[in-house]
C-alpha cells in the first residue's frame, strides 16, 4: 500500500529514532490524517455500520471527541500499515485531473512564477521573491542531511547565506545562475540514484524561472525519497513498539466509544457456538443419543480464537461488518480469502483430472506443473466482475483434455477415450457450484490445514498437506504463512480484549 502522506512528518520520525521509543512512534505517524481520513469517513458512513448491535448504552459525543477518535484511528492505522506492510511507501501527491484543487493549485503557482518573472525582468532586477525561494531551497537541502554531514552542512550554510545574498542583490553583484549551479550540484550529491536523471536535466535549463520551478519539482520528489528512507530506517524500531502503541491507541478509542468491541464480541460468540456445535456432533455416541452433561466438550480460548480467524476467510464483506480489532487488516484477509477460493477451484480441477486420467500421470512432475500453470492462468481474473466461472471451466475442461491426451500419447499409454473426456469435462464444470462435493472437500481440507498450522504455533516445518492438495502445496503454504503472520500480530495486540470477552462467553456456554 502506498499513501499520499505528509512527507516532512515521516522524515522527522526517521530523525527521532534515537529518542524515546514512544515518541519515535508518535512522530512516525504524526500528520497522517489527510491520507487515511477518507477511509475512516467511508467506513463510518457505510450501510454496514447501521447494523451495529447496541450492547452498550448510547451516549452523546462532541465533535471534538469524534475528531480526536478519528485522529487516533488514523495514527494507529498508519503505524500498523508501516509495520505489517513491508512494501509500504509514500508516493507523491497527484491531484485528480480537472479537479478543483488541481486547477486552484495551477492558477496559484502560475501567478507566483509570473510574478517572479516580472521581478527578474525589471531594470535593475528585483530579487525579493528569488531570495525567498533560495531560503526555502536551503532549508530543504539542510533537512536532507544526517547529523554526521558536517561538511555539507557548512557548505550549504556558507554558499546560501541569505544575508550575504541580499547584500549582493542590493549592490547589483548577485549571480543567480551561480547559486543555481551550486544548488543543482548539492541536489546531485544528496539525491537517490533514481533521481540522477532528473537532476541532470536541470543543468540544461538556462532560464532562471523555469529552472527554479523544476528545482522545486525535483526537491519534492527527493522529499518523498527521504521519507521512504526514514520509514525503512525506523521500521525495526516500530516493530518493537507497535504492539504497545496500537493497544494503547485502541484503548483510547474504546474509552471514547465504549461500543467499539460490539462486532468483535459477536464474531467470537459465533465462533464459539459454531465450534461447540461441531465438537458436540463429534462427541455424540453412535446411534445419536445425547451424551451426558459430563461428556460435553470443552472449548479453549485459543481454539475459539483460531476458529474465529478462519471464519474471516469465509466472510461476506458486502453484507457483514468486519470485527473492529481486525478492521485494519480487512483488505489483507479479503485478499487471502480470494487466493484460497482460487486455490480451491484449482485444487478441485487438478484432483478430478488426476483421478480420471491414467494411473501414474500425476506423478510426472513436468506434466503436473504444466497443467497447474494452464489452469492457474485461466483462473487469474477469477474475482473480476466480468469473469464467468462456468464459461472458464468449460474452456479449462477442453484444454485439460487436450493436455491429458497429448501426455498419454507421448507416454505410450492407452488413449483418453471420448467417454472419459465427456465425464472429465462434466466434473470440471461441476466445480463451478459451491455445493460441488469435490470443491467442498478441497475447501474443508484447506481450512483444516490452516487450522492445524495455527494450532501448531506456526512452527517449522509446516504440517503435512492433506491428501489431494499436493499439487497446490507450495501456494497453500505461502498463504498459510501470510495468514499466520496476520493472526499472530493481531493476537499480540488484542489478546487481552479477546481473553476478557471469551472468559464471559465460555462461562455462559
Swiss-Prot record:
Sorted keywords for this record are:
Phosphoprotein
Question: Region annotation Disordered: residue ranges?
Answer: 1-60
Q: Which InterPro entries match?
A: Tcp11 (IPR008862)
Q: Please indicate if the UniProt record lists Phosphoprotein as a keyword.
A: yes
The chain's disulfide connectivity reads none
Bias kind Acidic residues: ranges: 21-33
> What GO terms fall under cellular component here?
microtubule
Q: Which GO terms describe its biological process?
A: signal transduction
Q: Which residues carry this modification: Phosphoserine?
A: 56
Per the UniProt record, one Pfam family is Tcp11
Would you identify the family this protein belongs to, as annotated?
Belongs to the TCP11 family.
Q: What is this protein's name?
A: T-complex protein 11-like protein 1
Q: Which gene encodes it?
A: TCP11L1
Amino acid at each position: 500500500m502506498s499513501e499520499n502522506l505528509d512527507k516532512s512528518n515521516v522524515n522527522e520520525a526517521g530523525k527521532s529514532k534515537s529518542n524515546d521509543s514512544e515518541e519515535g512512534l508518535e512522530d512516525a505517524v504524526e500528520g497522517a490524517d489527510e491520507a487515511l481520513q477518507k477511509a475512516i469517513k467511508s467506513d463510518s458512513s457505510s450501510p454496514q455500520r447501521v447494523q451495529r448491535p447496541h450492547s452498550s448504552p448510547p451516549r452523546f459525543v462532541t465533535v471534538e471527541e469524534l475528531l480526536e477518535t478519528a485522529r487516533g484511528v488514523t495514527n494507529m492505522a498508519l503505524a500498523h500499515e508501516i509495520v505489517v506492510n513491508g512494501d509500504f511507501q509514500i508516493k507523491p501527491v497527484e491531484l485528480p485531473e480537472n479537479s478543483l484543487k488541481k486547477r486552484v493549485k495551477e492558477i496559484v503557482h502560475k501567478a507566483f512564477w509570473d510574478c517572479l518573472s516580472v521581478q527578474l525582468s525589471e531594470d535593475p532586477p528585483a530579487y525579493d521573491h528569488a531570495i525567498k525561494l533560495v531560503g526555502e531551497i536551503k532549508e530543504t537541502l539542510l533537512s536532507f542531511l544526517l547529523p554526521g554531514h558536517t561538511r555539507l552542512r557548512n557548505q550549504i550554510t556558507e554558499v546560501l547565506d541569505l544575508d550575504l545574498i541580499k547584500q549582493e542583490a542590493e549592490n547589483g553583484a548577485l549571480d543567480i545562475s551561480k547559486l543555481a549551479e551550486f544548488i543543482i550540484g548539492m541536489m546531485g550529491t544528496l539525491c537517490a540514484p533514481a533521481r540522477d536523471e532528473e537532476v541532470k536535466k536541470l543543468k540544461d535549463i538556462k532560464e532562471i524561472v523555469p529552472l527554479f520551478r523544476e528545482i522545486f519539482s525535483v526537491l519534492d520528489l527527493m522529499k518523498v525519497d527521504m521519507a521512504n528512507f526514514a520509514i525503512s530506517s525506523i521500521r525495526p524500531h516500530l516493530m518493537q513498539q507497535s504492539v504497545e502503541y496500537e493497544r494503547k491507541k485502541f484503548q483510547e478509542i474504546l474509552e471514547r466509544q465504549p461500543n467499539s468491541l460490539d462486532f468483535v464480541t459477536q464474531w467470537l460468540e459465533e465462533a464459539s457456538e459454531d465450534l461447540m456445535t461441531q465438537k458436540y456432533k463429534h462427541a455424540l455416541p453412535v446411534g445419536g443419543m445425547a451424551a451426558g452433561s459430563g461428556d460435553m466438550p470443552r472449548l479453549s480460548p485459543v481454539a475459539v480464537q483460531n476458529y474465529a480467524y478462519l471464519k474471516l476467510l469465509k466472510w461476506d464483506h458486502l453484507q457483514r461488518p468486519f470485527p473492529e480489532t481486525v478492521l485494519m487488516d480487512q483488505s489483507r484477509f479479503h485478499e487471502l480469502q480470494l487466493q484460497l477460493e482460487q486455490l480451491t477451484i484449482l485444487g478441485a480441477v487438478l484432483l478430478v483430472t488426476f483421478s480420471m486420467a491414467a494411473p501414474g500421470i500425476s506423478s510426472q512432475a513436468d506434466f503436473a506443473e504444466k497443467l497447474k500453470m494452464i489452469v492457474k492462468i485461466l483462473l487469474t481474473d477469477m474475482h473480476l466482475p466480468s469473469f464467468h466461472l462456468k464459461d472458464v471451466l468449460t474452456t479449462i475442461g477442453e484444454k485439460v483434455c487436450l493436455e491429458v491426451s497429448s501426455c498419454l500419447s507421448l507416454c505410450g499409454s492407452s488413449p483418453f477415450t471420448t467417454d472419459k473426456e465427456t465425464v472429465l469435462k462434466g466434473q470440471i464444470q461441476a466445480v463451478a457450484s459451491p455445493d460441488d462435493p469435490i470443491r467442498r472437500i478441497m475447501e474443508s481440507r484447506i481450512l483444516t490445514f490452516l487450522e492445524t498450522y495455527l494450532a501448531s504455533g506456526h512452527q517449522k516445518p509446516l504440517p503435512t498437506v492433506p491428501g489431494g492438495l499436493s499439487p497446490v502445496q507450495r501456494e497453500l503454504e505461502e498463504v498459510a504463512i501470510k495468514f499466520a503472520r496476520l493472526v499472530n500480530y493481531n493476537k499480540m495486540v488484542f489478546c487481552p480484549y479477546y481473553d476478557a470477552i471469551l472468559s464471559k462467553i465460555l462461562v455462559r456456554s
